[in-house]
Amino acid sequence: MSLTEIILSAVAELDGLKFTKPVECVYNPLNYAWDLHRQYLEKFGSGKKQVVMLGMNPGPFGMVQTGVPFGEVQAVKTWLGLKGQVHKPEVEHPKRPILGLESPRSEVSGRRLWGWAAQRFVTPKRFARRFFVY
């Protein structure tokens, strides 16, 4: 099974989860931002890695906007070089709108992580030879 197939299988299982009140909105960026997430997997997820960094609890201004782990918008657009459309989730919270790559907000942990990677490895390709962030 490829990494993309594994992720799609997990997404299908997660989509089966149902929540009751007080939960009103559940964002799954692997659905509405799949295009960018797929690009990220294909561009940076292949091959053997020495280090895999796992994140939890995606923030509202990072992966929730872009579909990319630690997906600080500027880093996704300029350093990782990903382009694409992010759709709206079925139910959107009015205080947490999904603006995708147009979001003006910055995600602090993503800015730090990708900033370190850019400073240390210069290009995402060099970083991805050894590291995979998920």
Language-model regions: role of each:
Residues S2-Y134:
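A polyanion-binding, active-site-adjacent surface
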